[in-house]
Amino acid sequence: MRLKCISMLIIGLLLSGVSAQEEAVNKAMEKDDSKDLKVGDIAPSWALMYAPGQFEFLKNWSEEEGKRLRKFTSQPNRNAVVMSFFATWCQPCMKELPILENVYQKYKDERIKFFLVDITEATRTIPGNENLPKAGPFLQKKGVTMQILYDTRGTVMKRYNAQTLPRLFMMDGNRQLTLTRRGFHAGEEEKFTKELSEEIERLLAELPPLKNAKE
């Protein structure tokens, strides 16, 4: 009985430590809600690294109406985009990730791109974050197969005012935001899955017809 009590005490201390760390990080990353991007806004463009020396561009898949995609000749078809900011210290992110992965598996062959934007490195200088696990191996162990993009300096995080995590954005093929979410709470898994799936179906139905690539 005594051993069980000690074990429970240790677990409690560990959980409180994680919670305190997360609270400290969020406080250090104070945000201004007035700068939030809203549905109908044009999503800020970005280029983010996914491997050393290799970059993904939002404009490869989604661009303002009337403008061509970045690689129009080889990839002329607009896609809807789902992007979620996360960090390995973020506990609510760990609740959102399995749902995103399940939805991704359902739609990965459709005209919609899923991106996880990691800000772990951008927040590593905050006290307590020095030894956080790197996102790639961390997510691989959790069975996450979505594309990870690394916002190592937090530049894109600031453009999207995504300091409170997880922070999710959905946009159509014209880079117009159609859904935004901040945070994730236990018990909303079913609601989130339904909301995400319905919006994806709507966006896919509204995409323009496929075009042939011009090599």
Residue ranges and their predicted role:
Residues 1-61, 179-181, 212-215:
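N-terminal targeting signals for export/organelle localization
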Residues 47-81:
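A short beta-strand-turn-helix
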Residues 61-64, 163, 184:
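A generic structural motif
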Residues 82-83, 114, 168:
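Hydrophobic beta-strand anchors of alpha/beta hydrolase catalytic cores
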Residues 84-90, 118-120:
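Aromatic-flanked redox-active Cys/Sec active sites in thiol-based oxidoreductases
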Residues 94-141, 152-159:
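Structural microenvironment flanking redox-active thiols in thiol-disulfide oxidoreductases
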Residues 143-147, 161-169:
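Structural micro-motif
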Residues 170-215:
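Thiol-/selenol-based redox modules, centered on thioredoxin-like
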